[in-house]
Each structure stands twice: as structure tokens, then as C-alpha cells.
Curated annotation (Swiss-Prot):
The active site is at residues 152, 174, 226. Disulfide bonds join 282-291, 353-457, 356-361, 424-438, 485-600, 534-560, 536-554, 730-751, 862-927, 875-907, 876-909, 881-891, 1072-1084, 1114-1189, 1119-1193, 1141-1183. It catalyses: Autocatalytic release of the core protein from the N-terminus of the togavirus structural polyprotein by hydrolysis of a -Trp-|-Ser- bond. This is Structural polyprotein. Residues 730-750 are annotated as: Transient transmembrane before p62-6K protein processing. It comes from Venezuelan equine encephalitis virus (strain 3880). Belongs to the New World alphaviruses that can cause fatal encephalitis. One of its GO terms (molecular function) is serine-type endopeptidase activity.
Length: 1255
């Protein structure tokens, strides 16, 4: 029939009868492992290929069970379907077997996974339950020879030996501990402090460890699990569980663990609950019962159940009671898709909508609230209609039910439309809440059409996309970077937020009133009650009836009103509904679709084009969306800038040697450091020297040149004046004597003119014509004297560059103290000189420095939500406000409302009606996910992560920089700290929001102001001690509509989010990196860390065992100053023997890259060094010998680099010798002029005085 034979993975199994074949005899034998794998593969292929299967054969001996049948029991859901189909086929051939059905139910139980099986095996003899009243209240475990049990777990350990041990209490860690007997120490857990991020195991499966926190999926682990250990893959204990708290879809665990030093550390997330099995008790009719086991449930006694829930609405076990009341005992537990069945306790309602199709109306889909605070573009609405339930109250997905004048009707959700400026996409609905994704718009409208009638409701609300990050994009990008954000959860999980419910007020139902003959008859629905109020001939009737009743006094239907009474359903506590008369039973249900932490894809702006200049950076920016550019200096004054760039621009910034950082959009920060480079040549001609120093130190260079110019000018002027004064004093006596003859020497010095000469030019002309030799002598004598004196002064003057030399004192014999800069990544090398021993090199490089302040949480603030009680309306009577006890609660009584109104209050009277309006403030539903924490910061502790090398021994360790806590390694004892500078980037008051820290002077607890940060305050997110001050003022309701109007200040939290400055992450001085969990600053380049070493004698080497240099000569082959190890020095030497020697520069002029070098008996060694000196001259210590290295350094070629300079920066570069030579020449020439003038003036004065005395 077919052109080819079909191919099968194995021969098809023939049809077998549905009854099991007789069991074959079994003989024990050992199957090869490969044969077992082939057999399992063959069986799996057969299961996937054929549908007609016989039942599994009876189980074999225990030895065969795990090999053959265990894999079959772990098949997925696809095989489950086959089993159902097989059951259907069997039903046709014979009656069902009850035992077989029971067996099938047992087989569907979930088998523990690999992690759980491993933990159960390890826990079997190392973890012991703690019993209390016959129940397991928690667990105790034996770790490292010690017994640990949570202190909050009461009861007795289920082991006689361990129960008899006397434990010690450590209340700080919530633990009790004791040493176990010696015979039990072989069976104890081992512990470890190594906790790389990843997954670990505990009794309930996998535990995720990330960012120092242990989390499990929500619902895994509960009360009674306190004391269970968390194990790694090697079976070692990494933590002990104490409790947990739900955080969205995951549960954060409170644990006790160990750090690198073996010290116990406790981590407790906020609002954590202890997981001891303590039964919560609830109350019903003065009788207590476990909240998880109520005596009644809603399906059997709805009215009584609502009353029970109302009594226990503030009980800590309300959630357990609500879940148990919804799920009646004996009812089959349904899947997780049917969570939040509690909304069957409620019903939809009609409420006033301010804008329907035509004006305001009573709408079945009135919109109560709209929220759009997430970063995913979704909108959550609360309406008077309900979703996920049909008209009968049963669960039905993608369905909306609504109240149409007392009748509950339903409609498919796809027939409901929602739109802003354009249509929205409805994602899902649950209870009173609807989740949709909407485009931007200034209003939102919901409508549906039923029986040719369109029902709609619109509310003003600005719907817009909220971008996350530092780029203001309007649509999520396809590609980009992942960033933490807040999104609306698309499920109805319990996340701790509630919406308040209460019994509905009475509603007029005209269909209950009928006219029978000449009298009025009221017929309430079956199982319900009705309140009848009539005014017939001056007679007032007010009566509650359960069955039909005739009122003969009334002859018209308009004289009577029948109010439908309901006490078996709740409605939302809306300000648009009247409150039921009397004490209203209230409750609360969970809010679905809350904000949760998630990951959003954010765009990355095009990388800026960077151009480097001398101490400057130019950024050419071309953003696609408005993007923030933030910069700061990595110095003591950050001088940060924060700018929103919307168009292509060019921005120029200056960069210093201490560093500069910029953050462009959502890109990671980039840092640059300027090098000590400049044009010109510090060793060249004067104009090159001036150009070089002008670019490096413009103000100092201008000042120096000005001073030099002033000195030269003053020198020339002073010399000229002195020469003129001396000449006049010398020639005056001879001018007054007729025919006086002037001595030749005086005439030459004073340039005296002859009798025939009248002017200088005439004198020169006379000498030129009559005596040219005298002419040249007259001109060369001053010049020769000037040259001679200048050369003499140059030889006498000693050129000394001004350097700051920081010498390191030699260490003692056993103890060594030094100081290293507190800057991550900067290596610090030193040596220990001990008499009789070779120098011991020490190298320290801090990889990370943490500054952790001690913080105290003052309060938490977030968005507030205004709660409004349904107005209490009393017709033809007066009311008073009851005492207020809720946060910022306001209460007012309004009279003269609702005259003769037929919609809502239905009052007969005109002005005697009263309404009591109440409004108060509470935390928003999304406060758990979107809130700010106000802390007070105190003294900070410092941790340094160091790479330490002492001699040939290295270690990576963490040390507390407090001057007290030592670290021991290889016999070396190291004590660090305290810091030389008690500095912290955190102010006394700080605010943490969205993973970032802000220095903000927030108001104290209880002193918040309306519209400002802290307008609502709570000690924790879940605590009930809420303080609020929002300027809430109630307004008079408008006649004709039941509502509670009010005015209120805008949210101070929202205003603070808009106005807040950049966080410390972008503005902290000294380049600090700010992190949270815990709040800390890392790698702040400020201050120095004192170090004290205690070094054992075993690490020292005798001098006789080390080489000694007999001759050494140092030459600088290449030297670039202010560059990372830009200097290369070659040392030619002759040593007594080969070996290893420590090298060190005692002064701070140079920083060496090498800590030790290998020496031969004769040769040369190359050493790399860094220096900030233009003309370095330093002594290099090699073992116990010293050699001097000196030379000239040139500036680096690169103006800007991407890493800091790895050398000491405690001094600036010196002035070059060339510059000093030119400077002294200039100043020396000016001094010579002054000296010559003074000498001449002195000679002339002495001659004049002598001549006068002689005369």
C-alpha cells in the first residue's frame, strides 16, 4: 500500500489486555550501567510513541524499585494526560476500582526534588525538631560541635541528650547555643563563610543568595521552619533560618550566618516575622479559636461570616481567617489561578459618575480611582463593576459583572472598551480592579454596550509614560540596558495592601412594591429582607419584613418605598454610596495588580565623542531622547553639574589631577585624570620654559614674570639714578673752578666732557675723531665689569630646587608602624630595617575601602491615599460626629441636604436632613514598593580589603580600620586605623529612595508639613503608627448627588521626587561610590590609614645570608614624570653573591613598582618608578646598600588618562635646573647693575669727602 515501510524506533508493542500479566519470577542480578541506560531510553521512546499502554507491572523487590519505576513516576504533565485517557478507556470495559482510584491519587503527590532529598538526608541526624504541645514549633541543628536553636522557639528538643544540655543565650542573634557531647561531634554539620552568589539548598528546595540576601519563592517556607539550616553543594551550613517576610513574588529570609573571620552575623529584612509555629487566635461571640480553623464559613453562613470577619478585621491573623472562611472545610483546594476568591464576598454597585455620555449619571461602571505610577505604561483602575466573577458570584475569567438597578448582569470583558486619546489594551481584571495599557491622554473613559444602550464613564486623569533611568524616553526600546524599576504585577497575589469594605446601605427597589386591589403589597425577594416606609393619610409606617405583606392604609404605590436590605455581601467603602444605618460591619480585601520590583529595558544614548585637551575634556553629545548629563570633580569639592540635554551640543569641562567623572544617560560612569603635561620644554630655552610653566601654573607663572620684570625695571632705574647722582656729585666742584683740570681716572669713570664738548654726542664725536682707543675703552669698561661680576655671581650662587621630601623612619626590631594613603588601587611599598637583618619588604594595595555609617530609621514616607467613609445620611433628623482616631481624620455635619431626592438618599423632608462626612489619610496601596526611608546617620565604621605581601608571604584580608581589631596571618599581626580624617559623605540626615542615597534635612517624626517631604510618616512600611498632615478640608456636598467633596495639599513625597537633586552617587566628594543594603560609601580617596605590624623573627633574614653590593651605579634611561611608572632606572652593580634583595626609596620622591629584585654576582637590574618631580634625585636602597639616582624627566604625552596616578602626590613637581639657570641669570644681571651703581656711588662719595676735607 505504501511505497516504503514505516520506520519505528523499536518494534510496536502488540495490544495487551488491560489486566496485568502474571508476575514473572525474579532473580537478583547486577545489570551493567550502560545496559540500564539503554533500557531506560528504550522505555522512554515507547512511552512517547504509543498510546495503547498496559498498566505498569506490579512493583518488584525493593532493590529494583529505584532503578526501573522511579523515573516513570517523575514524568511530566503529558503523561498525566495519557493516564486520564487510559482511565476513560478502562471505564468502558469495566467498573472503576475504588482502590485503584485511591492509588492514583497517592501517586499524584509531588516527589521531593534533588535538593530536597539531599537536605533531608543530611538533616536526618543533625537537625532535631523542637516540640511544643505535641506539635513541631521549630528546629535545632548541630553545627561545628555546637547546638544552635532559635531563642524565640519555645518547646523541648526531641532528643533526650540535647534537651538536657544547658544553653547560653545570645539575644543579639536570637540564638541559644551549647556544646554537644564528645560522642556526637562526629555527626555535626560543618559551616562555611564562603557564600558566592547563586543557589543553595534547604528543606524546601532551592534558596537564592544575591546581594547579601537569601530569598525563596513566595509560599515556600512558613511558620515552623525556624532553625532549619541552609546548605551548600558540599553539605556545609551557610546560614540558619529564623524567619521571613513576603516581598512581592519572593520571600526574604532572616538568617544567622558567619563572616570571613568566623564571627556570627545576623541579617534581618525589614518587617520580618519569626517562623515559630505560634497559633494566632481569633474571636467569635466571646469565644476564641485558631484563625486558620473558623467554626463557620461563607458558603454556609454568609451573614455570620461577614460579622466574624468584621470583629477580627484588626487581628494579626485576619488573612488566615479570611482564607479559611472563603475555603470551607472539606472543600477541595483549587489551583493558584483561583486565588483571591475572597471577592465573592462582595458585589458590584452603581455610583455617580461625573461625566457620562450626557452629563453626570448613576453608572454601573463608575470609576473610583486611577493609578499609573509604574514604569511600564500600565494603568490600574478601580471601578464599581467587578471582574473575574459571573452574575452568580462564581469565578469566571475575562468577564465583567455590574449592577443595573439592583440586578447583577455580566458581559464578556472583550466587549468592554477603555480609551484615553486612543484605545487601551485591557490586560486583566480582578475584583473591583482592572489592569490596562493605555496611551497618553488627559482623561480616561470606560464604556460598554448592552441591549443597544451604551454605558460610559469618564474621569479626568493624566495618563503618561513614566520612564525609568536618566533618559526621558516615551516608548520602551527594543534593545538597551536592564535597570531596576517598578511595574504592575499581572497577577492577583497577596502583597499586603487592602481595600476597605462594608455592608451596603439600603436601596430603593420599586419592583418590590405592587398594587393589589386598593392596597399596597410589598414582596421581598426570597431569603432577603426589605425595609418598608410609607406615609399614608398622615400615618407613618416603618417596618422590616421577610415575606410579602399587604398595607391596607395605603392606596397608591407612590406612598410607600421598599428598601432592599443586604447583610451577606460587602461593597467598597465608596464616598459615592450612602452608609448603612447603625453600626456598619466593615472588612478588608486584598488589592491585586500592585507595584512590584522588576527589570525594565532602558535606552542607551549614543556614546559621546570625546576630545582630550590640556586639562580639559570636550564632549560632543547627540541624544535621541532628552538625556541627563551629570559631572563631578573627584576632589574635596565636587562642583557637580546636572543638565538635561535635548539637542546636539558640545560641552567643555576642566579636568584636574585628582580626577573628573561624568555620567551620560544610562551609561555607566566614566572617570578621567589629568596628567602633569604641558606644551613647551622645562629644560629648553626661556620662551619654552615660560610656555611650559604658563600652561601648568598660569597664575604662578604670571606672578613670577611680573616680579622679575619689576625687579629688573627697579634695578635699572635705581642703577641709572645712582650713576647720574654720582656723576653730578663728582663733576660739580670742577665745574665751579675755572680752568680746572680733572684727573684722568675720574674723567673716564664719570664720562666727563672736554671743554670743547658740550653734549654727550659731541664728546663721543670728539673721541672718535681724536682718540678712538679711548672711545672704545670708554664703552667697554662698564660692559666688561658687568660681564665679570655676572659670571662671578653665577659661580657663587647654588641652584637648589625646592622639593618636599617625606622621609620614612626606620622600623624597630619587631614592630613596624607606617601610614598608607586611603585610596583604592594605589600600591604602597615600604621596608622594615632591623639591625642585623636584611630589609624586609612590605607591599600593601587596598582593593576596596568601605565606610559604613550607623543608621537609625526614623520613619518611612510614601504617597498617601485619602480614605472616605460612605456618608451617613439621616432623613428628617440630626447627627453628630463621633470621635476621630485615624490619621488626619476630618469629620463634618452638613444640614439641609438631599431635599425630596429620589436618587440615593430618598428623603421625604426638605431641610431637616443631615449628612456626616468623614475623610482620613492612609498609605497608598503601592507604598510597600514605592517609598522613601528617612535615616539618621551616626559614627561610621571603616573596612579595608587589602592585598598584603610581607616578605614572600601574601594574603588577601579584610581589616576593620579602628585601631583596635587585629588581623593575624602567617604569624604577622596587623592593626589598622583609625583614619587620619574623621570624614563621611553622609550628613546627619539622609534619605534612601530607589536604591540611592540623598543628603536631605527631613522634618522630625511628627513634625511633617502639608505638601512637603514627610507629610505622612510611619515607623515602618507595615506598621500602623501613621502620622499625617495633608491639610485635608471637607466641603459641603452638592445637592442632588451623594458624595464627600474635599480639598487637600498635593503629595509631598511626589513633589520631593520631582524636585530632588542628584543623589550622592553623582555628587559625593572624593570620588565616593555610594551603595545600599547596607548603606555605605566605597573607595573614598581621603585621608590615610595608619598601620602597625607585629612581625615574628622567623620572617627576617640575617644580613650574612643576603647579598652585599660592593659597587653600584644608577642611571635613568627614561623618565616621564606624573605618569604611571614612567621612569626606568638601570643599576649596574657588583654583589658578594647572588640572591634576592628588597628595594626601596626612603623619600617620597619616587614610588617603585618592584618590592624586591633578584641579583647576580655582577650585572645590572632594571627598576620602574613613578615620580612627580621634573628633576628627580633620590636614594635607592638595595638590601643594605644605597645608590643615588638622578636625572631629568620630561612631561607625559597624554593629557588625559583613564586611571589615577600610582605615585605619592604629597608634593608638586620642582622647577627644572634650566629654569633656575635662566632665572638666576636674569636676577643676577639685575643685581650686578645695582652693585656697580653702589660701588661707583661709594667711590665718588669717598673721593668727594676726601677732597673737601683736604681743601
Amino acid at each position: 500500500m505504501f511505497p516504503f515501510q514505516p520506520m519505528y524506533p523499536m518494534q510496536p508493542m502488540p495490544y495487551r489486555n488491560p489486566f496485568a500479566a502474571p508476575r514473572r519470577p525474579w532473580f537478583p542480578r547486577t545489570d551493567p550501567f550502560l545496559a540500564m541506560q539503554v533500557q531506560e531510553l528504550t522505555r522512554s521512546m515507547a512511552n512517547l510513541t504509543f498510546k495503547q499502554r498496559r498498566e505498569a507491572p506490579p512493583e518488584g523487590p525493593p532493590a529494583k524499585k529505584p532503578k526501573r519505576e522511579a523515573p516513570q513516576k517523575q514524568k511530566g504533565g503529558g503523561q498525566g494526560k495519557k493516564k486520564k485517557n487510559q482511565g476513560k478507556k478502562k471505564a468502558k470495559t469495566g467498573p472503576p476500582n475504588p482502590k485503584a482510584q485511591n492509588g492514583n491519587k497517592k501517586k499524584t503527590n509531588k516527589k521531593p526534588g534533588k535538593r530536597q532529598r539531599m537536605v533531608m538526608k543530611l538533616e536526618s541526624d543533625k537537625t532535631f525538631p523542637i516540640m511544643l504541645e505535641g506539635k513541631i514549633n521549630g528546629y535545632a541543628c548541630v553545627v561545628g560541635g555546637k547546638l544552635f536553636r532559635p531563642m524565640h522557639v519555645e518547646g523541648k528538643i526531641d532528643n533526650d541528650v540535647l534537651a538536657a544540655l544547658k544553653t547560653k543565650k545570645a539575644s543579639k542573634y536570637d540564638l541559644e547555643y551549647a556544646d554537644v557531647p564528645q560522642n556526637m561531634r562526629a555527626d555535626t554539620f560543618k559551616y562555611t563563610h564562603e557564600k558566592p552568589q547563586g543557589y543553595y539548598s534547604w528543606h524546601h528546595g532551592a534558596v537564592q543568595y544575591e546581594n547579601g540576601r537569601f530569598t525563596v519563592p513566595k509560599g515556600v517556607g512558613a511558620k515552623g521552619d525556624s532553625g532549619r539550616p541552609i546548605l551548600d553543594n558540599q553539605g556545609r551550613v551557610v546560614a540558619i533560618v529564623l524567619g521571613g517576610v513576603n516581598e512581592g513574588s519572593r520571600t526574604a529570609l532572616s538568617v544567622v550566618m558567619w563572616n570571613e573571620k568566623g564571627v556570627t552575623v545576623k541579617y534581618t529584612p525589614e518587617n520580618c516575622e519569626q517562623w515559630s509555629l505560634v497559633t494566632t487566635m481569633c474571636l467569635l461571640a466571646n469565644v476564641t479559636f485558631p484563625c486558620a480553623q473558623p467554626p463557620i464559613c461563607y458558603d454556609r453562613k454568609p451573614a455570620e461570616t461577614l460579622a466574624m470577619l468584621s470583629v477580627n478585621v484588626d487581628n494579626p491573623g485576619y488573612d488566615e481567617l479570611l482564607e479559611a472562611a472563603v475555603k470551607c472545610p472539606g472543600r477541595k483546594r483549587r489551583s493558584t489561578e483561583e486565588l483571591f476568591k475572597e471577592y465573592k464576598l462582595t458585589r458590584p454597585y452603581m455610583a455617580r459618575c461625573i461625566r457620562c455620555a450626557v452629563g453626570s449619571c448613576h453608572s454601573p461602571i463608575a470609576i473610583e480611582a486611577v493609578k499609573s505610577d509604574g514604569h511600564d505604561g500600565y494603568v490600574r483602575l478601580q471601578t464599581s463593576s467587578q471582574y473575574g466573577l459571573d452574575s452568580s458570584g462564581n469565578l469566571k475569567g475575562r468577564t465583567m459583572r455590574y449592577d443595573m438597578h439592583g440586578t447583577i448582569e455580566e458581559i464578556p470583558l472583550h466587549q468592554v472598551s477603555l480609551h484615553t486619546s486612543r484605545p487601551c489594551h485591557i490586560v486583566d481584571g480582578h475584583g473591583y480592579f482592572l489592569l490596562a495599557r493605555c496611551p497618553a491622554g488627559d482623561s480616561i473613559t470606560m464604556e460598554f454596550k448592552k441591549d443597544a444602550v451604551t454605558h460610559s464613564c469618564s474621569v479626568p486623569y493624566e495618563v503618561k509614560f513614566n520612564p525609568v533611568g536618566r533618559e526621558l524616553y516615551t516608548h520602551p526600546p527594543e534593545h538597551g540596558a536592564e535597570q531596576a524599576c517598578q511595574v504592575y504585577a499581572h497577577d492577583a497575589q497577596n502583597r499586603g495592601a487592602y481595600v476597605e469594605m462594608h455592608l451596603p446601605g439600603s436601596e430603593v427597589d420599586s419592583s418590590l412594591v405592587s398594587l393589589s386591589g386598593s392596597s399596597v403589597t410589598v414582596t421581598p425577594p426570597a431569603g432577603t429582607s426589605a425595609l418598608v416606609e410609607c406615609e399614608c393619610g398622615g400615618t407613618k409606617i416603618s417596618e422590616t419584613i421577610n415575606t410579602a405583606k399587604q398595607f391596607s392604609q395605603c392606596t397608591k404605590k407612590e406612598q410607600c418605598r421598599a428598601y432592599r436590605l443586604q447583610n451577606d455581601k460587602w461593597v467598597y467603602n465608596s464616598d459615592k454610596l450612602p452608609k448603612a444605618a447603625g453600626a456598619t460591619l466593615k472588612g478588608k480585601l486584598h488589592v491585586p495588580f500592585l507595584l512590584a520590583d522588576g527589570k525594565c529595558t532602558v535606552p542607551l544614548a549614543p556614546e559621546p565623542m570625546i576630545t582630550f585637551g590640556f586639562r580639559s575634556v570636550s564632549l560632543k553629545l547627540h541624544p535621541k531622547n532628552p538625556t541627563y548629563l551629570t559631572t563631578r570633580q573627584l576632589a574635596d569639592e565636587p562642583h557637580y553639574t546636572h543638565e538635561l540635554i535635548s539637542e546636539p551640543v558640545v560641552r567643555n569641562f576642566s579636568v584636574t589631577e585628582k580626577g573628573w567623572e561624568f555620567v551620560w544617560g544610562n551609561h555607566p560612569p566614566k572617570r578621567f585624570w589629568a596628567q602633569e603635561t604641558a606644551p613647551g620644554n622645562p629644560h629648553g630655552l626661556p620662551h619654552e620654559v615660560i610656555t611650559h610653566y604658563y600652561h601648568r601654573y598660569p597664575m604662578s607663572t604670571i606672578l613670577g614674570l611680573s616680579i622679575c620684570a619689576a625687579i629688573v625695571t627697579v634695578s635699572i632705574a635705581a642703577s641709572t639714578w645712582l650713576l647720574c647722582k654720582s656723576r653730578v656729585s663728582c663733576l660739580t666742584p670742577y665745574r665751579l673752578t675755572p680752568n680746572a683740570r680733572m684727573p684722568l681716572c675720574l674723567a673716564v669713570l664719570c664720562c666727563a666732557r672736554t671743554a670743547r664738548a658740550e653734549t654727550t654726542w659731541e664728546s663721543l664725536d670728539h673721541l672718535w675723531n681724536n682718540n678712538q682707543q679711548m672711545f672704545w675703552i670708554q664703552l667697554l669698561i662698564p660692559l666688561a665689569a658687568l660681564i665679570v661680576v655676572t659670571r662671578l655671581l653665577r659661580c657663587v650662587c647654588c641652584v637648589v630646587p625646592f622639593l618636599v621630601v617625606a622621609g620614612a623612619a626606620g622600623a624597630g626590631a619587631y614592630e613596624h608602624a607606617t601610614t598608607m594613603p586611603s585610596q583604592a588601587g594605589i600600591p604602597y611599598n615600604t621596608i622594615v630595617n632591623r639591625a642585623g637583618y636584611a630589609p624586609l619588604p612590605i607591599s600593601i594595595t587596598p582593593t576596596k575601602i568601605k565606610l559604613i555609617p550607623t543608621v537609625n530609621l526614623e520613619y518611612v514616607t510614601c504617597h498617601y491615599k485619602t480614605g472616605m467613609d460612605s456618608p451617613a445620611i439621616k432623613c428628617c433628623g440630626s447627627q453628630e460626629c463621633t470621635p476621630t482616631y485615624r490619621p488626619d481624620e476630618q469629620c463634618k455635619v452638613f444640614t439641609g441636604v438631599y431635599p425630596f431626592m429620589w436618587g440615593g438618599a430618598y428623603c421625604f423632608c426638605d431641610t431637616e436632613n443631615t449628612q456626616v462626612s468623614k475623610a482620613y489619610v492612609m498609605k497608598s496601596d503601592d507604598c510597600l514598593a514605592d517609598h522613601a526611608e528617612a535615616y539618621k546617620a551616626h559614627t561610621a565604621s571603616v573596612q579595608a580589603f587589602l592585598n598584603i605581601t610581607v616578605g614572600e608571604h601574601s594574603i588577601v584580608t579584610t581589616v576593620y580600620v579602628n585601631g583596635e581589631t587585629p588581623v593575624n596571618f602567617n604569624g604577622v599581626k596587623l592593626t589598622a586605623g583609625p583614619l587620619s580624617t574623621a570624614w563621611t559623605p553622609f550628613d546627619r540626615k539622609i534619605v534612601q529612595y530607589a536604591g540611592e542615597i540623598y543628603n536631605y534635612d527631613f522634618p522630625e517624626y511628627g513634625a511633617g508639613q502639608p505638601g512637603a517631604f514627610g507629610d505622612i510618616q510611619s515607623r515602618t512600611v507595615s506598621s500602623s503608627d501613621l502620622y499625617a498632615n495633608t491639610n485635608l478640608v471637607l466641603q459641603r456636598p452638592k445637592a442632588g448627588a451623594i458624595h464627600v467633596p474635599y480639598t487637600q495639599a498635593p503629595s509631598g513625597f511626589e513633589q520631593w521626587k520631582k524636585d530632588k537633586a542628584p543623589s550622592l552617587k553623582f555628587t559625593a566628594p572624593f570620588g565616593c561610590e555610594i551603595y545600599t543594603n547596607p548603606i555605605r560609601a566605597e573607595n573614598c580617596a581621603v585621608g590615610s590609614i595608619p598601620l602597625a605590624f607585629d612581625i615574628p623573627d622567623a620572617l627576617f633574614t640575617r644580613v650574612s645570608e643576603t647579598p652585599t653590593l660592593s659597587a653600584a651605579e644608577c642611571t635613568l634611561n627614561e623618565c616621564v614624570y606624573s605618569s604611571d611608572f614612567g621612569g626606568i632606572a638601570t643599576v649596574k652593580y657588583s654583589a658578594s653573591k647572588s640572591g634576592k634583595c628588597a628595594v626601596h626609596v626612603p623619600s617620597g620622591t619616587a614610588t617603585l613598582k618592584e618590592a624586591a629584585i633578584e641579583l647576580a654576582e655582577q650585572g645590572s637590574a632594571t627598576i620602574h618608578f613613578s615620580t612627580a618631580n621634573i628633576h628627580p634625585e633620590f636614594r635607592l636602597q638595595i638590601c643594605t646598600s644605597y645608590v643615588t639616582c638622578k636625572g631629568d624627566c620630561h612631561p607625559p604625552k597624554d593629557h588625559i588618562v583613564t586611571h589615577p596616578q600610582y605615585h605619592a602626590q604629597t608634593f608638586t613637581a620642582a622647577v627644572s635646573k634650566t629654569a633656575w639657570t635662566w632665572l638666576t641669570s636674569l636676577l643676577g644681571g639685575s643685581a650686578v647693575i645695582i652693585i656697580i651703581g653702589l660701588v661707583l656711588a661709594t667711590i665718588v662719595a669717598m673721593y668727594v669727602l676726601t677732597n673737601q676735607k683736604h681743601n
